[in-house]
């Protein structure tokens, strides 16, 4: 089967937990996608819990995946999810409760068709902060892209600060994203930026200043 297993992958800090994205799997409809989690146990990789399937046909869940340090929290990007329009995208977070993977809070959806939210995702070490890339978003021009950062308050995911928009149209900002361990510094890849020639690309780094995201360096 053309499942495309390994399109994304993440490890816990100790390397004993593994998450594998399988975006073309058909468990909940054609190309709904899924993520499987494995634990290293007695010399073999054993699946922990059931497959976490995409919500619907064509979601491509597992295009991106991130794990908390202890491997007990997993974030799953489904950039082709269509709740807010075709390819608006979606991000879901699950936590291991000892017997199964249970969703934490509501799904986070892209704003509109083409946003492709969930193309990239990153988690802080404790799994309480997530950064989500939506490179097709048009907030600062067509396909300028953006990243949104959310924090878990015990009941739901609350956005921290404003959307971090790409600099200009076609930046595709949010194609890749990374978070520091404490979730207070985020690095954002924008491969379509033309600052040093067509599609030369760039990376911007932001730090949470208590009220807003402040760029570090140029």
Predicted features and spans:
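Conserved beta-strand/short-helix segments
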Residues: 1-218
């Amino acid at each position: 089967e053309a499942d495309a297993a390994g399109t994304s992958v993440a490890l816990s800090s100790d390397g004993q937990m593994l998450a594998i994205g399988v975006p073309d799997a058909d468990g909940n409809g054609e190309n709904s996608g899924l993520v499987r989690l494995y634990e290293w146990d007695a010399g073999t990789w054993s699946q922990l819990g059931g497959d976490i399937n995409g919500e619907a046909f064509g979601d491509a869940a597992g295009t991106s995946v991130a794990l908390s340090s202890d491997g007990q929290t997993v974030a799953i990007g489904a950039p082709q999810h269509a709740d807010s329009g075709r390819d608006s995208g979606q991000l879901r977070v699950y936590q291991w409760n000892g017997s199964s993977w249970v969703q934490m809070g509501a799904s986070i959806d892209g704003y509109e068709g083409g946003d492709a939210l969930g193309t990239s995702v990153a988690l802080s070490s404790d799994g309480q902060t997530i950064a989500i890339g939506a490179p097709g978003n048009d907030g600062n021009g067509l396909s300028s892209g953006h990243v949104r950062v959310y924090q878990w308050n015990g009941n739901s995911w609350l956005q921290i600060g404003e959307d971090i928009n790409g600099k200009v149209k076609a930046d595709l900002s949010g194609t890749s994203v990374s978070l520091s361990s404490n979730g207070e510094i985020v690095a954002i890849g924008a491969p379509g930026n033309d600052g040093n020639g067509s599609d030369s690309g760039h990376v911007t780094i932001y730090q949470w200043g208590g009220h807003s995201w402040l760029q570090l360096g140029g």
